[in-house]
Amino acid sequence: MRRVRPLVALLAGLVSTFLLVGAAPAPAAGAPAQPVQVAPAAVTPQVEPEVEPVAATPLRVASFNVRCANCSRNDRTNKREKNWEVRRTKVISQIKAEKVDVIGVQEASPGILKGTKTSQFEDLAKRLGEPYQLTNTYRYGCARSTSYKSCTKVDNGASADVRIIYNTERLELLDQGSKQLDKEKATSGPRFLAWAIFQDRTDGRKFFFANAHTEPGQSKAKRALRKRQANLIVSTIKANNPDNLPVVLVGDFSSTKLTSANTVYDVLMKSGLVIDPLGNTKKQKSTKKATAEKLTNVKYFTLNNFKSKPTSYKGYALGAHIDYILVSKSIRVLEYKVVLSVKNGKFSGVIPSDHNMVRATILLP
């Protein structure tokens, strides 16, 4: 006969243990039923996917001294210099051909063009057409901004013949302003810094753009004035750029590495605010210090004075530049170009100005 008592006893013990540990005790007679305790299900934490930063899109910036209209009419350099009404077509075609996103122009006068009611800078912007637009449309910093006569000064951001024009499809203007760079009246008219803060519509990046034209001349007094103007450029940019956005500074600084003193350049380099992507320091001959990744026509002097052919210097791979594009160290410069139309070593067609436009393609950080 088979023995089953030990097995029965074992099963009884297991049932008893289950009732004690895994099951709630039965309520007393007449007592309300107790809720059954259910262990919560394990929750898998949600991990947010890493968002890749949007890659920067190449941006084209430029500087162009377009030669004042009245200068061509009243103080012509030579027979190759044409009136503004002839030159402007070439100025506009070069800006468009270079697909510039933002440009600082100098000598785009607020004075009225002969036989019109339009100033030179207004004429340039109008003929460039959409999507180009001025950052500031006031002619003068006066209560009646259309005329300098009987001027009651106001700060409306006007900047005389120093102007910024930008591509509205690519850039959004966030802020703008100006600063006069000479308390005393300069012999050739007041000098200004114009500035603007932009946001790139393609990737959301912001940057600070500034354009200046400092006092020309190589006398001791002129050099001293330019030094004061350079220091004012630095302090104005810092005061209006509290977020320390990357800076692009362009302009005609009225001296070169070959002049007795390259005052503005030296002050700007010492400030640490910007660097020169050409590395075009005093008497520099080679391109070994350049940080720009591609160099185009940089051997040519940016001042052409309406000569028949562009000026270069024997033994100098980097020309003497009077027009500059300087950038924050964090900005990558893909190309730096001196823009000119040359055929068989000579200027081709109408020479747009006594200066050659300079253009850089950059990547913002």
Predicted regions and their residues:
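N-terminal, active-site-proximal structural segment of metallo-dependent hydrolase catalytic domains
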Residues: 2, 21-127, 142-145, 154, ...
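Bacterial N-terminal signal peptides that target proteins for export
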Residues: 1-11
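Bacterial N-terminal signal peptides
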Residues: 10-22
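Metal-dependent phosphoester-hydrolase catalytic domains
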Residues: 238-247, 255-365
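Active-site neighborhood of phospho(di)ester-bond hydrolases with catalytic His/Asp-centered motifs
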Residues: 104-106, 135-138, 248-252, 275-281
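Active-site environment of divalent metal-dependent phosphoester hydrolases
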Residues: 70, 110-113, 143, 216-218, ...
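Structured beta-strand-rich core segments of catalytic domains in phosphoester-bond hydrolases
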Residues: 108-214
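Active-site beta-strand/loop signature of hydrolases that rely on acidic residues for catalysis
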Residues: 60-66, 91-117, 165, 196, ...
